[in-house]
Amino acid sequence: MKHALSASDTKIQRARRHLVELESEIGDFVASRPVKFNVETIENSGGRSFNFHMHMAPVSDNVGAIVGDIIHNLRAALDLTAAEMVRIAGEDDKEVYFPFCENVEDLDGTIKSRNFDRAGTEAVALLQTLKPYRTGNLALQVIHDLEIHDKQRAFIPSAMSAASPIVRMWDDDGTINPQIIGDPAWPNDIKIMFPNEVGLQGRKLVPTLQELVQLVDDIVEAFRGLASRGLKDDDGPPQLLGLLKRNLPPRVTEA
């Protein structure tokens, strides 16, 4: 027998499988040695000058597509949760969606326009605690924004290399002659980051997505706990775990 919110669980499980696929795709990209360095020597009347160049291969389009799949499943898990909470309350789940809005002043109206008010006062109180608006819970709002972005344009993550090659500057006779020592394509510390246009500058792709998946999982669990109590309106507002109140830090910290 299926338990409450099992459809949402399925979407979260799919998001986790896509995360594994994403890590594999990024691993293949890094293994391909996408960064190369070279020294350009320029001869002129005043002598020689040298330019150092770094060439970075683009990240595979598959990476952006997989990210879109992860976000789509997370948003679907939230919408399925909203609809099932309405059904549990004995109401019609037609046109029911998880509410997102710009600010707290818009939240009550958005709850009604997305028909989530049919889920009952406790479910609404739980949702309000989540602060699903831009100035409230940034991590939750990011899921909404990325879902819209994925529908409108391709998601193209950026690659960064934090390493530089070892360069020998002089020949044995003292002549300046910069040369890269060893393989100019290896090793490199490569990080895959969110593109600037989605508002997540400076955040590593995989750790941030892992946080978002866990956040949605926690939200579903909170609503499941409410559903198991029978949605009684006289029990007072639900209490959320502290981890549901977390937000994305300014930058994802290094592991």
Each PLM stretch: what is its role?
Residues 1-255:
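Acidic, Ser/Thr/Gly/Pro-rich intrinsically disordered interaction regions
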